[in-house]
From Swiss-Prot:
It comes from Mannheimia succiniciproducens (strain KCTC 0769BP / MBEL55E). ATP binds at K251. Belongs to the class-I aminoacyl-tRNA synthetase family. Glutamate--tRNA ligase type 1 subfamily. This is Glutamate--tRNA ligase. Its cofactor is Zn(2+). A motif ('KMSKS' region) lies at residues 248-252. The gene is gltX. Its EC number is 6.1.1.17.
Length: 480
């Protein structure tokens, strides 16, 4: 029987990349960068992007992790043309190919016991040889196919595997370094390295972008592809991401999963912009729209060196995008933060107004939601330091006067509120701060907020007047 790829693919598509995470945990920033590079390369070349879930590790793979990966990809807006495909749904296909390989002499059954393999390894180590299988079962005719066995790929014993890595250049591995890889376990399940090969073949993958930790798998996979008569993709192995201390990025460096960044109030545009620059660049340019990334991205410009993750740089980018993206769009992401923090925004200013007021001040949307709570709900008490400094006996007169002015307003907007504050200061012959600061603490509970006119307009007349009275009562009670 002839070995051939399974899927009917569009022959006009010249580039087809894939992202193939294992659902054993959340999508971390290293995986997200790999997905982004793979996605950008496909888009840059008018190609297609395939999403594949490599869930052959049945013990560690979970539906929750799969859902989290899909959520993260959707949040980042890294859409896919094909998939998601699940390896566990393709076991029949893998076993079909393995059986054909046995039939054609490309693979063989191995009946060796664990004890024999352990003894072989000890002998080879004692002789200072590289541990590898000795092909004891290659021509075995004594055992029945129904006896317990694994299946091994018959790896070439001569020559070398040579491939041109799109990031690292020429890589050559002698076949003497490679073993006869197990491609099917004794329980009948195919192994990771084999499933990957069949998937890449069936799915017409032309370019494999993945982490440098996969380099050792590549020669083994290339040899299997050659045995199948399948085309060899271009491989591009990207470097690891380290923390700012030079150590491999981990939880101790802060958030490492993509959705943690969403939870912390980052915009997807900021994270994508940061990740694309973490190992790739275009001159001195720092800010890239997604359209610019697609236009400019080339694998040849990806760095071979490890990159250092810098949270301050990501924060800077996030504030840039909060400030520069349309307020309507930012407000959609901000709404999720309010929901997470249990803040009911049904009574208060439009969220686009919050973005306009606080966009220059806040580095994250989480900070923006937390610091604008007073627009939507009452606060229990005043910030202790702010109250001590500004809610003194001398503040009663300015607060009573400005309350009187605000009560008398026919309309309620930022301009009218500003005039009321200005008139109060003029009549009392004091600086604007003598009115504005006690007023700020009175209506927000804290010593910092956007300008008082827009803050008052956003909070609303009824709440503002009630809070001013509450502050006056607080001062009088404190000084009674």
């Amino acid at each position: 029987m002839e070995l051939k790829a399974l899927f009917n693919l569009d022959p006009n598509v010249k580039v087809r990349t894939r992202f193939a995470p294992s659902p054993t945990g959340y999508l971390h920033v290293g995986g997200a960068r790999t997905a982004l590079y793979s996605w950008l390369y496909a888009k840059h070349n008018d190609g297609e992007f395939v999403l594949r879930i490599e869930d052959t590790d049945l013990e560690r793979s979970t539906p929750e992790a799969t859902a989290a990966i899909l959520d993260a990809m959707e949040w980042l807006n890294l859409t896919w043309e094909h998939g998601p495909y699940f390896q566990t749904e393709r076991f029949d296909r893998y076993n079909e190919v393995i059986d054909q390989m046995i039939e054609q002499g490309l693979a063989y059954r191995c009946y060796c016991s664990k004890e024999r393999l352990e003894e072989l390894r000890h002998q080879q180590e004692a002789n200072k040889e590289k541990p590898r299988y000795d092909r004891h079962c290659l021509h075995d005719h004594e055992h029945s196919p129904y006896e317990p066995h694994v299946v091994r790929f018959k790896n070439p014993q001569e020559g070398s595997v040579v491939f041109e890595d799109a990031v690292r250049g020429r890589i050559e591995i002698s076949n003497h370094e490679l073993d006869d890889l197990i491609i099917r376990r004794s329980d009948g399940s195919p192994t990771y390295n084999f499933c990957v090969v069949v998937d890449d073949w069936d799915m017409g993958i032309t370019h494999v972008v993945r982490g440098e930790d996969h380099i050792n798998n590549t020669p083994r996979q290339i040899n299997i592809l050659k045995a199948l008569g399948a085309p060899i993709p271009v491989y591009a192995h990207v470097s690891m991401i380290n923390g700012d201390d030079g150590q491999k990025l981990s939880k101790r460096h802060g958030a490492v999963s993509v959705m943690q960044y969403r939870d912390e109030g980052y915009l997807p545009e900021a994270l994508l912009n940061y990740l694309v620059r973490l190992g790739w660049g275009h001159g001195d340019q720092e800010i890239f729209t997604l359209e610019e990334m697609i236009k400019l991205f080339e694998l040849e410009h990806v760095s071979k060196s490890a990159s250092a993750f810098n949270t301050e740089k990501l924060l800077w980018l996030n504030q840039h995008y909060i400030r520069e993206l349309p307020a309507e769009y930012v407000a959609q992401h901000l709404a999720w933060q309010y929901q997470e923090q249990g803040i009911d925004t049904s009574k208060g200013p439009a969220l686009t107004e919050i973005v306009s007021m606080l966009g220059e001040r806040c580095k994250t949307l989480k900070e923006m939601a937390a610091s604008s709570r007073y627009f939507f709900e009452e606060f229990d008490g005043f910030d202790e330091a702010a109250a001590k400094k500004h809610l003194k006996a001398a503040a009663v007169e300015p607060l009573e006067k400005v309350k009187e002015k605000l009560t008398a307003l026919s309309g309620w907007d930022a301009h009218s509120a500003h005039e009321a504050i200005e008139q109060t200061a003029a009549e009392l012959e004091v600086g604007m701060g003598k009115v504005g600061m006690p007023l700020r603490v009175a209506v927000t509970g804290a010593g910092q907020s956007p300008s008082m006119d827009v803050t008052l307009a956003g909070i609303g007349r009824e709440r503002v007047l009630a809070r001013i009275q509450k502050a006056i009562d607080f001062i009088k009670a404190k000084n009674a």
